[in-house]
Amino acid sequence: MLPITNSLTYIIPILIAVAFLTLTERKILGYMQLRKGPNITGPYGLLQPIADGLKLFIKEPIRPLNTSPTLLILSPILALTTAMLIWTPIPMPHALTNLNLGLLSILAISSMAVNSTLWAGWASNSKYALIGSLRAVAQTISYEVTLGIILLSILILTGGFTMQLLTTTQKHIWLLTTSWPLTMMWFISTLAETNRAPFDLTEGESELVSGFNVEYAGGPFALFFLAEYTNIISMNLLTCIMFINPGPTQHPELFLINLVTKTLLLSLTFLWIRASYPRFRYDQLMHLLWKQFLPLTMALCLLQASLLVSISGIPPLP
């Protein structure tokens, strides 16, 4: 009974946070476009995400005739499962599983999520969905390269792979202050990794064909939607832990308040960017990564590694 209770107390708060992030996004976009946003369902529109979720899950799932039924259903389930698994090593202030290679496991699980996008495009048996999924996979895999190198740079600085060590390292000074170019590139790469504006080429909502999920409706579409917003929150949580010190570990209640506040501010920045910037062209997206971010992150990674080696060679003061 206890493992089931633990799992529920771990999953339910994430799903509630995701539900209200969608409402926050619609409200922020509304006010930035000089309108109200959802304000009818419940007080101040607070019940809107619950109504939307119910509507999507009670709709009949439409399956085109030529699709691969097993893969079509498995893809959204895999997307949400991998999005949830990313949260297991994250300390809030205690992790669900205290892994020795916590940061690497997060990177590995997020890489697995690419399979769900590819499967969805393939199973739809539609050329538009397949082209959309290939484009999405190319974007996600490309930006994982810079995320991996930035992660390696941070590991070189902290000297370990655990999340707790990152918190201890930033006790006196944030890594944002010492590695701000890496932080900026990490933040922009997380935008691309989670398919958010101005990099939302994976699911161009304003386009005639939205992307890999063009054949999805109802419940399976809702699972993809939940996975996307879960990834947004988890990436911002990771950014907070890596660069802007989530808080004092000796005071668990302060740690949680600090972590949630900083993550919320980063998530609001994501929404603000969506309301402010137009979509990039695909060639600009790839040019930014392969010709600008990649050489710069590699140079900074080598600089940090060489600095540590050179400083360790300096004899101690008498």
UniProtKB/Swiss-Prot annotation:
It comes from Varanus rudicollis. Core subunit of the mitochondrial membrane respiratory chain NADH dehydrogenase (Complex I) that is believed to belong to the minimal assembly required for catalysis. Complex I functions in the transfer of electrons from NADH to the respiratory chain. The immediate electron acceptor for the enzyme is believed to be ubiquinone. The chain crosses the membrane at residues 1-21, 71-91, 101-121, 145-165, 172-192, 224-244, 253-273, 294-314. It is a multi-pass membrane protein. Its EC number is 7.1.1.2. It is an enzyme of class 7 (translocase). PANTHER family: NADH DEHYDROGENASE SUBUNIT 1, NADH-UBIQUINONE OXIDOREDUCTASE CHAIN 1. It is found in: Mitochondrion inner membrane. Belongs to the complex I subunit 1 family. This is NADH-ubiquinone oxidoreductase chain 1. PROSITE patterns: COMPLEX1_ND1_1, COMPLEX1_ND1_2. The gene is MT-ND1. The keyword Transmembrane applies. Pfam families: NADHdh. Keywords: Electron transport, Membrane, Mitochondrion, Mitochondrion inner membrane, NAD, Respiratory chain, Translocase, Transmembrane, Transmembrane helix, Transport, Ubiquinone. It catalyses: a ubiquinone + NADH + 5 H(+)(in) = a ubiquinol + NAD(+) + 4 H(+)(out). One of its GO terms (molecular function) is NADH dehydrogenase (ubiquinone) activity.
